[in-house]
Amino acid sequence: MSAQPVDIQIFGRSLRVNCPPDQRDALNQAADDLNQRLQDLKERTRVTNTEQLVFIAALNISYELAQEKAKTRDYAASMEQRIRMLQQTIEQALLERGRITEKTNQNFE
């Protein structure tokens, strides 16, 4: 699928971007989210310069992305540790079962 031009509105400005057809809804949702963020920033900060608002929003989004990446790394590390613990538990159980089986077999001989 090739990208097709899509017109979106960002803070009152029209912008044409190329987007694959199957990602058009996601693009529109992202544009809506950005518009809402810019509007909220404008109200909270009383900054009226659109360029400045865009930079502040970009910094906020970059910070949020960095936070989410850190959470993902922490979660992945936690899952790796849990998997290692489960593997050790399973290996230990199999070893113990093997020992019990060996003892049982020796008793029957």
Curated annotation (Swiss-Prot):
The keyword Lipoprotein does not apply. One of its GO terms (biological process) is FtsZ-dependent cytokinesis. Pfam families: ZapA. SUPFAM superfamilies: Cell division protein ZapA-like. Residues 21-100 form a coiled coil. Its main location: cytoplasm. One of its GO terms (cellular component) is cell division site. Homodimer. Interacts with FtsZ. This is Cell division protein ZapA. It comes from Shigella dysenteriae serotype 1 (strain Sd197).
